[in-house]
Design a protein with these regions (language model features):
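Alpha-helical segment proximal to the catalytic Tyr-Lys
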Residues: 3, 44-45, 119
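A conserved structural motif in NAD(P)-dependent oxidoreductases
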Residues: 82-84, 95-106
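A glycine/serine/threonine-rich, flexible loop-to-helix segment
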Residues: 48, 61-94, 137-138
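Active-site helix of classical SDR
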Residues: 31, 39
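Residue(s) in the substrate-gating loop at a strand-loop-helix junction
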Residues: 15
Length: 138
């Protein structure tokens, strides 16, 4: 971006776990927190060259996500002491808006941050989680 001299735009996709700790996920939470901090550092370093850097933080994306594959779904259900078919409703109910998060929601957030609609935004975190209070930006 710098060599081209025309600015640029980077959007990281991190996770709610970059802001909120979870049991048995220390490595994942730490990696996502580092990703968020890297984005903020790069926003500082790139601003003079008009390079914007922002972060999208999804939580519990209900389709096309690891949440619904392999043994992970069963492990999550067991951790919450429920059946696997109750898990989607659990994720919906724990959000403030009581709504599910889908891949399209994440794509729209990325599009927004990559577009001119957010031309004056850099170093920001956009949580796409239907209002998970655990991940309120602090």
């Amino acid at each position: 971006f710098r060599a081209q001299g025309i600015g640029g735009n980077v959007v990281f996709v991190a996770s709610k776990n970059g802001l909120a700790a979870s049991p048995n996920a220390a490595a994942y939470c730490t990696a996502k927190a580092a990703e968020i901090h890297l984005a903020r550092c790069l926003a500082l370093e790139g601003a003079e060259a008009q390079i914007r850097v922002n972060v999208v933080n999804p939580d519990a994306v209900l389709r096309g996500s690891k949440i619904w594959t392999g043994s992970w779904k069963q492990e999550r259900a067991e951790a919450y002491n429920m059946k696997t078919d109750e898990l989607e409703e659990h994720y919906r109910k724990r959000s403030l808006l009581k709504r599910s998060v889908f891949p399209e929601d994440i794509a729209e957030a990325i599009y927004f941050l990559a577009s001119e609609m957010s031309a004056k935004s850099t170093g920001n975190i956009l949580n796409v989680d239907a209002g998970n209070a655990q991940s309120f930006t602090r």
